[in-house]
Amino acid sequence: MRHYELMVILDPSLDERTVAPSLDTFLNVVRQHGGTIDKVDVWGKRRLAYEILKHAEGIYAVIDINATPATVAELDRQLGLNESVLRTKVLRHNK
């Protein structure tokens, strides 16, 4: 298991109260493959440095995960297929 940090930028038209539950459905992939979710931190709506798909704002969420590389790749793939996800970035922490 490796430690990862995942940043997700979501469509700003989403209701901010539904962000954490909708992310939780994606994070079930990690739990099903034996990984753990250490922390989910929803930053809320922030201005983007540049427009993404004609959006000037996005809802940011940062998630700390312990999982295998294959599990994180599958999570990133599923997030990429969702239309409400504007951008994802996965970073591996070096300890």
Swiss-Prot record:
MF term (GO), any: small ribosomal subunit rRNA binding
PANTHER family: MITOCHONDRIAL 28S RIBOSOMAL PROTEIN S6, SMALL RIBOSOMAL SUBUNIT PROTEIN BS6M
Purpose: Binds together with bS18 to 16S ribosomal RNA.
Record-given protein name: Small ribosomal subunit protein bS6
Family affiliation: Belongs to the bacterial ribosomal protein bS6 family.
Gene Ontology annotations for the cellular component aspect, listed alphabetically: cytoplasm; ribonucleoprotein complex; ribosome
Keywords: Ribonucleoprotein, Ribosomal protein, RNA-binding, rRNA-binding
InterPro entries recorded: Ribosomal_bS6, Ribosomal_bS6_sf, Ribosomal_S6_plastid/chlpt, Transl_elong_EF1B/ribsomal_bS6
CDD domains in alphabetical order: bS6
Any one Pfam family match given in the protein's UniProt record, by short name: Ribosomal_S6
Gene Ontology biological-process annotations: translation
